[in-house]
């Protein structure tokens, strides 16, 4: 009797796992279909976030931020996470980049446009085809750290080729963790962007100020520009100015 009960429990567990696996596959199909619908119908909207020089308040550039249909009630990060799960990362990033580049001509000629790309997309020949024909001296490619880099040699080769054509390379979320610092050390970016968590508490925590000062020294020593992301209060602004952030 005990053996029969044990076998019944094993069957129930196996059936539950099979059912869960089927649900996960069905959910993944639904997610992929949602992404394909957005891609096919061009439903990505771009919001341009001004990048301001702290010294004089002049807008020097714009970061292109992708926005997706509101009816799905999903964050931007979730859309890109879903794209990674379904093998559509490069397609979604290129679509967002294309939507951003469509706004390029409307920007003041003295400003630059910053577009987010993953290491995988940065290595894509399709990206080079997409940006061809634009003023590459005004284009910044912001390499995200959300996916691991398998081959820094290949990534460096691709980024160096883009830099030779005038594109500037930025590293996002610097100071957020080891991955971003490794990006800075391995990629030799033209622009280093401070993680928003450092900026958020810069006027309250001396250690944050010390870290930002160290990153500023590093940036100056390597010929890179430093950008503080997410400045929201006058106290944050004044503290960053005192630290020498441009």
Map each language-model feature to its residues.
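Catalytic core of bacterial c-di-GMP phosphodiesterases, primarily the EAL and HD-GYP domains
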Residues: 58-61, 88-157, 230
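Conserved long alpha-helical elements within nucleotide-processing catalytic cores of c-di-GMP signaling
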Residues: 77-81, 90, 160
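The catalytic core of metal-dependent phosphodiesterases that act on cyclic dinucleotides
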Residues: 130-202, 218-246
């Amino acid at each position: 009797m005990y053996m029969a009960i044990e076998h019944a429990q094993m069957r129930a567990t196996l059936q539950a796992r099979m059912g869960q696996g089927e649900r996960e596959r069905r959910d993944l199909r639904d997610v992929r279909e949602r992404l394909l619908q957005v891609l096919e119908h061009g439903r990505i909207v771009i919001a341009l976030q001004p990048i301001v020089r702290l010294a004089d308040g002049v807008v020097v550039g714009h970061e292109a931020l992708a926005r997706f249909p509101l009816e799905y009630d999903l964050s931007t990060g979730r859309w890109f996470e879903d794209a990674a799960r379904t093998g559509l990362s490069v397609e979604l990033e290129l679509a967002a980049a294309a939507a951003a580049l469509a706004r390029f001509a409307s920007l003041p000629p003295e400003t630059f446009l910053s577009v987010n790309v993953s290491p995988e997309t940065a290595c894509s020949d399709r990206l080079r085809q997409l940006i061809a024909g634009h003023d590459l001296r005004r284009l910044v490619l912001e390499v995200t750290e959300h996916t691991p880099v398998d081959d820094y040699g290949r990534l460096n080769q691709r980024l160096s080729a883009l830099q030779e054509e005038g594109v500037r390379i930025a590293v996002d979320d610097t100071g957020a963790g080891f991955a971003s610092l490794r990006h800075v050390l391995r990629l030799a970016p033209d622009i280093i962007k401070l993680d928003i968590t450092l900026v958020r508490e810069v006027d309250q925590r001396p250690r944050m100020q010390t870290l930002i000062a160290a990153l500023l020294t590093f940036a100056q020593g390597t010929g890179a520009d430093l950008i503080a992301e997410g400045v929201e209060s006058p106290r944050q602004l004044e503290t960053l100015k005192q630290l020498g952030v441009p």
